[in-house]
């Protein structure tokens, strides 16, 4: 079972997850401070690293526009040939309901191939959860590790309408996980994005 959507108070399993918490740096993870209102984009770049015969991924956070980002390294993780990533985005004051994103969750899991787009629809409130299973394709693997590029989530709708968050992915030699949305944040509002990347085959 993946970790619940909450502010982390204890150590994280470095192979399972990472998070960005607005105006807060916890467990050595990156801290992002937003300025004003409007679109927020956080890019988490994961590069393949080979160290002592171990296949590792090194993650850094940065490239935030319409705001400022504190960039740091946060974890290494083994990748096997089949990997699932779950992305959760939440906006709220102390993880309470605020600005239309609440406590509901919507999820789905399926395989994705190069260039394939996924979409799921939910209500106008709720945390958005998207599971995507990345299956190894020989043409797009490197040293037996499945890595993907330009995996993005965007398209939050508000005002009582449905949400359609598009997930796209490509299998290439490097990974960029981009989470974007038309999230409106006030000074007293927390902004929480977590991602979980872990091997399915040990």
Locate the predicted segments by residue.
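Enriched but not universal
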Residues: 1-25, 201-202
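Extended low-polarity, hydrophobic cluster-rich segments
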Residues: 4, 75-79, 102
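Beta-rich globular "head" domains
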Residues: 16-72, 110-165
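Fold-core signature of tandem repeat domains
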Residues: 44-46, 85, 101, 132-134, ...
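Residue-level recognition of beta-strand termini and adjacent short loop/turns
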Residues: 48-53, 79-83, 138-139, 171-175, ...
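A cross-kingdom feature marking solvent-exposed beta-strand/loop segments within repeated
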Residues: 70-79, 168
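Short beta-strand-plus-loop segments that form exposed binding edges in beta-rich domains
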Residues: 89-93, 182-185
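Short, structured beta-strand segments at or near domain termini in extracellular proteins/domains
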Residues: 96-109, 189-202
């Amino acid at each position: 079972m993946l970790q619940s959507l909450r502010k982390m108070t204890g150590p994280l399993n470095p192979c399972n997850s990472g998070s960005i918490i607005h105006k807060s740096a916890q467990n050595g993870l990156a801290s992002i401070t937003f300025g004003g209102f409007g679109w927020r984009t956080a890019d988490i770049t994961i590069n393949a690293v080979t160290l002592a015969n171990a296949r590792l991924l090194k993650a850094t956070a940065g490239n935030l526009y319409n705001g400022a980002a504190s960039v740091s390294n946060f974890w290494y993780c083994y990748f096997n040939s089949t990997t699932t990533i779950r992305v959760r985005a939440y906006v709220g004051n102390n993880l309470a309901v605020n600005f239309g994103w609440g406590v509901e969750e919507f999820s789905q899991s399926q395989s994705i191939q190069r260039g394939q787009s996924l979409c799921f629809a939910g209500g106008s409130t709720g945390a958005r959860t998207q599971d995507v299973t990345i299956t190894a394709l020989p043409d797009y693997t490197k040293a037996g590790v499945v890595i993907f590029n330009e995996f993005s989530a965007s398209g939050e709708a508000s005002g009582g309408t449905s949400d359609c968050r598009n997930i796209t992915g490509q299998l290439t030699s490097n990974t960029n996980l981009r989470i974007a949305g038309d999230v409106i944040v006030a000074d007293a509002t927390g902004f929480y994005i977590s991602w979980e990347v872990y091997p399915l085959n040990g």
